[in-house]
């Protein structure tokens, strides 16, 4: 072990996220001066099986959302356990923190404390190695730029409007490279603003930078997007496909055992009726991917959805799998879904994140690297997407710097890779072959 790559200092602080809530930022410095800084994201619609984000609970300070406890855990406990360790041994460092926490869901130290350190260590190690983060994590073959899932209409828990589904996304699949994909997305985003204005609808944006208009139905949200695609000079389906994040756990009524779609004429639906409703949407519109179509605990409903649509579209488990290899293994075993959403703070360490992506790929499930609704300028997920050749990234709309930071970092990575960079477009959906 080289002394130069040993961890010399670990320092955490409380900073602000894109929603004006506190989050954890960690600085790690190695003996040779190599430095890494990472900020932790936070979700709005969280799966009940996610790793625990430690909040202070003091209502007199940030309404109880302070993260001083997590910061103190880094500065007083975690730092002592990893000082002097080699930053290049990510497995040992993450394992040490997980053991120090000692709980199944990281509730003692907080996933936000552990993850901040985990990512900052990797960044410092990359600097020490003289490599960009994507190359340090992914090695020689990291070169696939992801197809962006751009969330241009927000509903559900991400917006104060009457749309049931949380996200309506566009995927620029005909682009020759990421740079052009980003341009296509931006042009459709601006086109959509014009379309909404023309209908006299609100063009304020939600948490993830998408528009949050009041529309009469979920279908109308898709219709206005299709209009915007055409007005931007592109062909729906051929050039740009549609993605949905239904976030069904948010509109599932536990007592009634029904799904309540307030934007629909017949609001109450059983799992079977909801699957049929989705099937009709998929037949009618160029939908290629659907996330969290059913409640996270409705495994029988998920099985029906997978049997009905699993060969036609990508079915992504977010709240269902919570970036957890145990949950994912159950899903693979039961033939549920065909894709996993990867959110670093759902599981709480870089090692476990990479393990989930690896497990998904081995089972022919795709892995979609994702932001959270509460973000910062940290662009680690851009590097994770390229490092793992995941082929897909979900990081919001074409507004708000907290979202654009990830896209801009991908532009830089693509430029750095030069002729070695690849962009698979529609072929990224290897789970549908």
From Swiss-Prot:
Catalytic activity: (2R)-2-phosphoglycerate = phosphoenolpyruvate + H2O
Binding residues for (2R)-2-phosphoglycerate: 166, 343, 372-373, 394
Residue ranges of the region described as Disordered: 37-59
UniProt-annotated catalytic positions: 208 (proton donor), 343 (proton acceptor)
Co-factor binding details: Binds a second Mg(2+) ion via substrate during catalysis.
Keyword terms, alphabetized: Cytoplasm, Glycolysis, Lyase, Magnesium, Metal-binding, Secreted
Record-linked InterPro entries: Enolase, Enolase-like_C_sf, Enolase-like_N, Enolase_C, Enolase_CS, Enolase_N
Gene3D superfamilies: Enolase-like C-terminal domain, Enolase-like, N-terminal domain
Main localization (coarse): cytoplasm
Annotated binding of Mg(2+), by residue: 245, 291, 318
One GO cellular component term: phosphopyruvate hydratase complex
HAMAP family: Enolase
Family: Belongs to the enolase family.
PANTHER family xref list: ENOLASE
Task of the protein: Catalyzes the reversible conversion of 2-phosphoglycerate (2-PG) into phosphoenolpyruvate (PEP). It is essential for the degradation of carbohydrates via glycolysis.
Name of this protein: Enolase
Native species: Leptospira biflexa serovar Patoc (strain Patoc 1 / ATCC 23582 / Paris)
């Amino acid at each position: 072990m080289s002394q130069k790559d040993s961890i010399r200092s670990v320092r955490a602080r409380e900073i602000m996220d894109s929603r004006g809530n506190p989050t954890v930022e960690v600085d790690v410095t190695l003996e040779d001066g190599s430095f890494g800084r990472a900020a932790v994201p936070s979700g709005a619609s969280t799966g009940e099986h996610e790793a625990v984000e430690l909040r202070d609970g003091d209502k007199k300070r940030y309404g109880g959302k302070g993260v001083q406890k997590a910061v103190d855990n880094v500065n007083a406990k975690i730092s002592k356990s990893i000082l002097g360790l080699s930053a290049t041994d990510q497995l040992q460092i993450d394992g040490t923190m997980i053991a120090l926490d000692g709980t199944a869901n990281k509730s003692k130290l907080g996933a936000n404390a552990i993850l901040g350190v985990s990512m900052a260590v990797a960044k410092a190690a990359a600097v020490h190695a003289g490599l960009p983060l994507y190359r340090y994590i992914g090695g020689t073959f990291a070169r696939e730029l992801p197809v962006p899932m751009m969330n241009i209409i927000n509903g559900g828990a991400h917006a104060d409007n009457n749309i049931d589904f949380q996200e309506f996304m566009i995927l620029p699949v005909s682009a020759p490279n990421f740079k052009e994909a980003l341009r296509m997305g931006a042009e459709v985003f601006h086109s959509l603003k014009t379309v909404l204005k023309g209908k006299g609808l609100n063009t304020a944006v939600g948490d993830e930078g998408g528009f949050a208009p009041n529309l009469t139905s979920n279908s109308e949200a898709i219709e206005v997007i299709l209009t915007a695609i055409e007005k931007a000079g592109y062909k729906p389906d051929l050039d740009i496909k549609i993605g949905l994040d239904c976030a069904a756990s948010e509109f599932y009524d536990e007592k009634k055992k029904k799904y309540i779609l307030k934007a629909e004429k017949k609001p109450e639906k059983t799992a079977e009726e909801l699957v049929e409703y989705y099937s009709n949407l998929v037949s009618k519109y160029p939908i290629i991917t659907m996330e969290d179509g059913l409640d996270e605990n409705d495994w029988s409903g998920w099985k029906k959805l997978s049997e009905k649509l699993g060969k036609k579209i990508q079915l992504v488990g977010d709240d269902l799998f919570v970036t957890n290899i145990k949950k994912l293994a159950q899903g693979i075993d039961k033939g549920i879904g065909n894709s996993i959403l990867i959110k670093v703070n759902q599981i709480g360490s870089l090692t476990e994140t990479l393990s989930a992506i690896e497990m998904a790929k081995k089972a022919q499930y795709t892995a979609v690297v994702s932001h959270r609704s509460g973000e910062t300028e940290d662009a680690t997920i851009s590097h994770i997407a390229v490092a793992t050749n995941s082929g897909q990234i979900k990081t919001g709309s074409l507004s708000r710097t907290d979202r654009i930071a990830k896209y801009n970092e991908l532009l830089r990575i693509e430029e750095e890779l030069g002729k070695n960079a690849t962009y698979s477009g529609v072929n990224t959906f290897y789970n549908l072959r």
